[in-house]
Amino acid sequence: MLSKTIAAAVQGIDATMVTIETTFDWGTQIVIVGLPDTAVKESTERVKCAINEAGFTFPNKTVVVNMSPADIKKEGAAYDLPIAIGTLASDEVVPADRLSKYMIMGELGLDGSVRKIKGALPMAILARELHLEGFILPKENASEAAIVNNLKVYGVDHISQVVQLLNGEQPLEPTVIDTRAEFAKAQGNFPFDFSDVKGQDNVKRAFEVACAGGHNILLIGSPGSGKSMMAKRLPSILPPLSLAEALETTKIHSVAGSLKSGTTLLTTRPYRAPHHTISQVALVGGGTYPTPGEISLAHNGVLFLDELPEFNRNVLEVMRQPLEDRQITISRAKYSTLYPASFMLVASMNPCPCGYYGHPSKPCVCSPYQRQHYLSKISGPLLDRIDLQIEVQPVNFEELADKTPGESSESIRQRVIQARALQNMRFQNTPGIHCNAQMTTAMLHQWAEPDSEGVELLRNAIERMNMSARAYDRILKVARTIADLEASVSVRASHIMEAIGYRSLDRGNYFTF
């Protein structure tokens, strides 16, 4: 008897329907066709053992499994459960006509237990789009999938529960999640606050500007000046995720398999801080079977690269295209996979190998060549893509001893939210543009044209600092953000002056010996 089970394959961060057809033939083996990978082919023994251990009898026939469409690669062990249920349906253990109402996914243990899978959220979204009655999947993934409304999500621990559900012997209660309540519940819970930071008012201001416009920022300072400490507090002043952003962010982490069991919705912006030994594939994504990298896991959030010159230069260079396009395409011989990568880059570095160039009390022991060589590890095109380049000076004793708390993250965040609200109104009719950092050159002429005094100031700066055309655009974007923080309709000379002050590495005299 032919049975058809509905499953899914994840491509990028979206799912595609896969139909698993099962029937019997002469012999005693399992044959799987339809472009399965090694893990799917190995499911034959897992399926056979799981069915027998669950108290059912595996058919003493050849089981032929066809996974269509045949041109889509089926990867991973998540097809164990639908193959097993399809086999039981062909053997009339469960009614085959019931299978058309459900999507079924899950990895099987040899004892029939159902184990966690990757990509449950995009699969659940697909199941709703197909107007299916429900989605049967591992219990560990149930909360994640249940944020999709108008879909019954059944979390199971064992294959026998699926059989009982399909036979109507023991109905399961679907997992129910109030998506909007979950979204609102965890908003604003941050472990770090800017009120803990002593001094560094200029750096706090730079962070405020960066968050208000979604700009990339580089911190340059000696060890112990507070670069990493302040970077950890950056998420606390970013504007909250919208529900659409939260769903998209959760989808990426679902595909990567990085969601913890019981997680429903990611409600705070991601903060990723990979070590400087990271590989290209781990940073931008890829592999034999492409998975999202750190730049995609930081989508709608922050990617913090500490000690930037210590990263492999080739690893840093692969970020250039995603920083511009805010997405990354992983190409293989027969297909391409697209992952979102709209993140805010926050990087830090020492000014020289010893770390003390420009320190007020500790002398630098590096030669001029060593300083220039250290900085040259970061290419000019990459530096051009970093809007704000800030020098971080050590905090003096008086500031450290001051018991007065600094300005709280919440008060800074409110100013950031107000500036973002202006940008949301500005770009409401421009799909894909949400903040000033994403503006095109044409938009700069429309929204960031400075007054006559600002134009003259900008001309002098460009000529003296020998800036690139990209750096010129970055200054205008930052100036527009500064104007938004002041609720100013126009970009004035004072805004241009502050934006130029955030281009430390563009100054021809940065390393003066």
Task: Give the residues covered by each predicted segment.
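P-loop NTPase nucleotide-binding/switch module
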Residues: Q170-V209, G213, P240-I295
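The Walker A (P-loop) glycine that initiates the GxxxxGKT/S ATP-binding motif of P-loop NTPases
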Residues: G221, G285, E307
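Residues immediately C-terminal
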Residues: L110, L303-F304, E310-F311
